[in-house]
Amino acid sequence: MIARRIWRSHRFLRPFSSSSVCSPPFRVPEYLSQSSSSPASRPFFVHPPTLMKWGGGSRSWFSNEAMATDSNSGLIDVPLAQTGEGIAECELLKWFVKEGDSVEEFQPLCEVQSDKATIEITSRFKGKVALISHSPGDIIKVGETLVRLAVEDSQDSLLTTDSSEIVTLGGSKQGTENLLGALSTPAVRNLAKDLGIDINVITGTGKDGRVLKEDVLRFSDQKGFVTDSVSSEHAVIGGDSVSTKASSNFEDKTVPLRGFSRAMVKTMTMATSVPHFHFVEEINCDSLVELKQFFKENNTDSTIKHTFLPTLIKSLSMALTKYPFVNSCFNAESLEIILKGSHNIGVAMATEHGLVVPNIKNVQSLSLLEITKELSRLQHLAANNKLNPEDVTGGTITLSNIGAIGGKFGSPLLNLPEVAIIALGRIEKVPKFSKEGTVYPASIMMVNIAADHRVLDGATVARFCCQWKEYVEKPELLMLQMR
């Protein structure tokens, strides 16, 4: 009866139907084989797992297929499904459940981080957690089992099974405390690991008890103070303990790259294979400064913070309308240039989790106020490591606002498959000469455009930059052509 119910759920989700379970559509891979060798107890394999999104704006995902099931016992393996195009593995951040917990359909099971975003994985089945296969911090490949669920009436007997039997079925059994993990970012967890600290014993001072970098360093200092005291005592008795302790503080450390940092390695490595050229220009931002001040003085919404960036983004979109090849991508296999219909302008953001480039969709159809609100939303999500996969995919051109941190000149690398990226320097007052020879102060910003020389030539980029510069220096021209 249990097997029939499980099979009905598979038939409902699969694109084919069958009247029996005796003929699986795919060969069972070796890594799915269980301890039992009898045909009756051998699990069958269904279609490769994919993700389905539950709810229009939700960031929760679930696997629409169990990778392997045991029809005799009611065990279902829930795999890590495909979290996005080109994603082969994810880092497990934390568990929302522990072994023995009851779970409902669409209940969050865990949170994982791919190269592009942080995603909650939810349960497709109702049952109890029989086995958790990984701990926070583990790198899990797509298709590997995340958790084993006991479904229907067999769950009570499964959860009372001897622990050694469960280990044989699904791998090593972890302690509940280690599996749940502390609420923190990958960078903070790696820092704690490098310092030899169990992050679960640290009291977090961040939002919702999140363990921050400062918490780890503070805990490390306290631990180091105690260690130093002990070392000093040994130094009096033993002689050379102090020098041994001092030398150990300067040992090499290996820091694994995770999440966005790992994605940056892949993207920048690919970028080195593309022929770049750079075009540098100065833009007078006096009018931009006045416009920002006007918006600030007439702002009636306290939740909106006006900056230079929305106007730069909108003026960039207006220039792209006249030079569509700058808003394109290149297909090296077919030697074709794909002109993008939408202006999805990405903005590079440096966060404590790494560099991420979310993009504002359809800028050509948005007002300055709408761009300001969307930019604020993306910045908030990026700071909290909550960007959706849709927010970081589909970009057509990128702005890197290095001037917000410091520096007036940058030399960016392409964010493939885009063909252009623009580094914005700091706006600063410098002396300039007028046509009459008098000196006057001007707010100048240096911009550096990196372009794919397979698609764009110097003349095209120069004309494009001059058009963008004109819109920035004379924002009233935007009013003539805005739709």
Curated annotation (Swiss-Prot):
Active site: H453, D457
EC number: 2.3.1.168
Source organism: Arabidopsis thaliana
Major localization listed first in the record, in broad terms: mitochondrion
Family from the record: Belongs to the 2-oxoacid dehydrogenase family.
Compartments, as annotated in UniProt: Mitochondrion matrix
Highest taxon, organism lineage: Eukaryota
Ranges for domain Lipoyl-binding: 76-150
Transit peptide: 1-75
Binding partners and assembly: Forms a 24-polypeptide structural core with octahedral symmetry.
Peripheral subunit-binding (PSBD) domain span: 183-220
One annotated GO biological process: fatty acid biosynthetic process
Cofactors named for this entry: (R)-lipoate
Free-text tissue specificity from the UniProt record: Expressed in the non-photosynthetic organs such as siliques, flowers and roots.
InterPro entries per UniProt: 2-oxoA_DH_lipoyl-BS (IPR003016), 2-oxoacid_DH_actylTfrase (IPR001078), 2-oxoacid_DH_E2_comp (IPR050743), Biotin_lipoyl (IPR000089), CAT-like_dom_sf (IPR023213), E3-bd_dom_sf (IPR036625), PSBD (IPR004167), Single_hybrid_motif (IPR011053)
Residues found modified as N6-lipoyllysine: K116
Protein's UniProt name: Lipoamide acyltransferase component of branched-chain alpha-keto acid dehydrogenase complex, mitochondrial
PANTHER family documented for this protein: DIHYDROLIPOAMIDE ACETYLTRANSFERASE COMPONENT OF PYRUVATE DEHYDROGENASE COMPLEX (PTHR43178), LIPOAMIDE ACYLTRANSFERASE COMPONENT OF BRANCHED-CHAIN ALPHA-KETO ACID DEHYDROGENASE COMPLEX, MITOCHONDRIAL (PTHR43178:SF14)
Role according to the record: The branched-chain alpha-keto dehydrogenase complex catalyzes the overall conversion of alpha-keto acids to acyl-CoA and CO(2). It contains multiple copies of three enzymatic components: branched-chain alpha-keto acid decarboxylase (E1), lipoamide acyltransferase (E2) and lipoamide dehydrogenase (E3). Within this complex, the catalytic function of this enzyme is to accept, and to transfer to coenzyme A, acyl groups that are generated by the branched-chain alpha-keto acid decarboxylase component.
PROSITE patterns assigned to the protein according to its UniProt record, in alphabetical order: BIOTINYL_LIPOYL, LIPOYL, PSBD
